[in-house]
Amino acid sequence: MSVDAVGGAVEGAPARLALRVQYLGGHFFGWQWQPGQRTVQQCLEEATERIARHPVRYHAAGRTDTGVHASGQVVHFDTHKKLAPETWVRGLNSLLPDDIAVRAAAYVSDHWHARFTALWREYRYCIHNSTVPDLFVRAQSWYYPYCPLDSEAVAAALATLPGHHDFRAFRRAGSSRPHSLVHVYTAECTREGEQIAIRVRANSFLYGMMRLLIGALAEVGSGRWSVERFAGLWQAGNREQVKYAAPPQGLCLVGVGYPDDPFKTNGIGFARCHTGQEKPEARLGNGDLESREERPPHEMSPLH
């Protein structure tokens, strides 16, 4: 695949476009298409097909579950539509619902894959540890009023995770993955006032892994489990003792790493937007999008 002066794909074989996207997961039934349900993949594909005028299929670095957010999800699709990356960004954002945003776009090689080329994913889990709720953080955190959580004990428990290990203790039933080996690169806990943030970076994540992990860490933070018990349970693969999953709204996919960041050199920047330098064929005309008004700037639960 080759690219013209404005970043649009040269006519011929389909081009592959990578996007960095954000979404608020509260009103989605996860990333992946589900018949009769509202999903992130469905919304992106429907908006893209209105521009491309042909069917598209999206692939994501991480297939987030119902209620889980993303601030740094990376996806890709193939298209014959010849548009500059910044034109794709503007066009998609004009069609997408308010709880999805495209933040960057870049053309990549035909061999690049949002999921399989990725080196790591990073998730953040936020806990609002207070006796009084805060409505402005509750939608993106786990409100935990039951007792003060010891963030230092949580950090000590997280320190047992880095390395290449079998994390079957944190795998939810129903996974089709043939093994439960994961390489954790970093795992840390920070606290600022009432807000606790737990971040884990790994080459991949098991089905339900982060929410089960947070449920176990809450046991440590509350003092019900020692750090030694936590480490012993997961190292022994004792799934029966990890009974609860933290709620989904505190979880967010914050980043995905690649050998070469496609958005660093080819992604759009604010300075490139609305420069008036696009070639005519790279602009969106009235026939490319349906008429639309321009937008102004602008508790733990049992696991089954």
From Swiss-Prot:
The biased composition feature labelled Basic and acidic residues covers 289-298
InterPro entries per the UniProt record, alphabetical: PsdUridine_synth_cat_dom_sf, PsdUridine_synth_TruA, PsdUridine_synth_TruA_a/b_dom, PsdUridine_synth_TruA_C, TruA/RsuA/RluB/E/F_N
Record EC number: 5.4.99.12
Q: What GO terms in the biological process aspect are recorded for it?
A: tRNA pseudouridine synthesis
Q: How does it assemble?
A: Homodimer.
Described by its record, this protein's role is as follows: Formation of pseudouridine at positions 38, 39 and 40 in the anticodon stem and loop of transfer RNAs.
What family is reported? Answer: Belongs to the tRNA pseudouridine synthase TruA family.
The record's listing under HAMAP family reads: TruA
This chain belongs to which protein, by name? tRNA pseudouridine synthase A
Its source organism is Gloeobacter violaceus (strain ATCC 29082 / PCC 7421)
Per the record, the gene is truA
